[in-house]
Amino acid sequence: MAASPVLAVDNSSVAADQLKSIIERIERLEEEKAGLAGDIKDVYAEAKANGFDTKVLRKIISIRKRDHEERQEEEAILELYMQALGMA
């Protein structure tokens, strides 16, 4: 038995409304993300103006995001490789 045309229109209308809502939410979040990226850029500029090395700041932030054990393992491997190359 085929679905009635009214039911098909209602389902497609609901799907269209959901899709529109999802797209609008993503667009709003993308705008917020762009605003936050601008704020972060401003903080780095402030740090640089105060004499801080922004490359080092970015590295520290990257390190702080990682798990302590994962970071220790990577540092141990780095030390091993540097010793193998006569750099340590």
From Swiss-Prot:
Name of the protein in its database record: UPF0335 protein Mnod_5968
InterPro entries associated with the record: GapR-like, GapR-like_DNA-bd, WH-like_DNA-bd_sf
HAMAP family, per database record: UPF0335
Coiled coil, from the record: none
Annotated signal peptide: none
Top-level taxonomic group: Bacteria
Pfam assignment, any one: GapR_DNA-bd
Family statement drawn from the similarity comment of this UniProt entry: Belongs to the UPF0335 family.
GO MF annotation: an example: DNA binding
Species in which this protein is naturally found: Methylobacterium nodulans (strain LMG 21967 / CNCM I-2342 / ORS 2060)
